[in-house]
């Protein structure tokens, strides 16, 4: 809603009064600019100079991957972030985790594209968070040891295969649900099955959205009894997060918490 949490500092390009031109930053992009501002401040205070300051360009591959994986709008600023990161990958300077993930996907980092991030690397990192523990993906991206990175990348690849099998089963369920509803005359579509996995509903929503060109939210039972956890995907012209914000204000008893951006 419009109520901001109590905090010493809130960094969000969408907060009222913020003149930062790019309003579609992913969280990793926000953090990258925070680090840049912090580096500038520390340099001005004499903590280091331009020759001894931390090299933030070493993070550009991670920023690019996070920007693509978060499916944010690729405005000019985000395109610059992605291009810089891809350039680092192509020059063989990516972190061991990204290099290992390129290897397990059979893709060539020397010719890396945003599609490699979106359809090769990101699904394997996300598979850990969807099915078990996101920490596996984080550890893979943070390790400096190529051997450890390779082992973790293999584990992520295995989890992704498991995720695909689960997604295929849930997609059959979703297709059956859609076939029995008059979706052509609906502004939005919501789907639910009691045995769906909450970590995969976003993928199901995305596929159905592409098929019927409607905003779709898919739900699964939450770990907390009595609640459902959903994930949505929207279409051009309908800002999903703003729509959920409107619903939460009209019916605060329906939505426990939510987040996201225009398209997801």
Residue positions per predicted region:
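Short gly/pro/ser/thr-enriched loop/turn and capping motifs at secondary-structure boundaries
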Residues: 1-3, 9, 17-19, 223-227, ...
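Short, well-ordered coil/turn elements that cap or connect secondary structure elements
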Residues: 4-5, 211
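Short alpha-helices
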Residues: 5-47, 59-66, 260-261
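Hydrophobic helix-and-loop "lid/oligomerization" segment in the mid-to-C-terminal part
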Residues: 40-263
């Amino acid at each position: 809603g419009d109520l901001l949490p109590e905090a010493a500092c809130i960094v969000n390009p969408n907060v009222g009064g913020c003149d930062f031109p790019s309003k579609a930053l992913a969280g990793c992009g926000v953090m990258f600019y925070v680090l840049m501002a912090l580096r500038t401040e520390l340099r001005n205070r004499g903590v280091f100079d331009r020759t001894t300051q931390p090299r933030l360009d070493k993070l550009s591959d991670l920023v690019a991957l996070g920007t693509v994986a978060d499916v944010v709008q690729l405005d000019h600023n985000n395109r610059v972030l992605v291009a810089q990161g891809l350039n680092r990958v192509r020059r063989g300077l990516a972190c061991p985790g990204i290099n290992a993930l390129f290897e397990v996907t059979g893709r060539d980092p020397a010719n890396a594209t945003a599609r490699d991030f979106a359809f090769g690397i990101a699904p394997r990192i996300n598979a850990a968070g969807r099915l078990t523990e996101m920490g596996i993906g984080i550890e893979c991206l943070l390790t400096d040891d190529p051997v450890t990175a390779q082992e973790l990348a293999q584990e992520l690849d295995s989890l992704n295969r498991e995720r695909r099998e689960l997604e295929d089963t849930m997609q059959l369920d979703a297709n059956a649900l859609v076939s029995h509803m008059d979706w052509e005359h609906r502004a939005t579509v919501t789907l639910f099955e009691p045995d769906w996995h909450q970590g995969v509903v976003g993928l199901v929503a995305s596929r159905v959205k592409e098929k019927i060109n409607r905003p779709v939210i898919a739900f699964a039972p939450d770990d907390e009894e009595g609640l459902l956890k959903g994930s949505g995907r929207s279409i051009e012209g309908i800002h999903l997060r703003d729509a959920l914000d409107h619903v939460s204000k009209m019916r605060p008893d329906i939505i426990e918490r939510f987040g996201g951006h225009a398209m997801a």
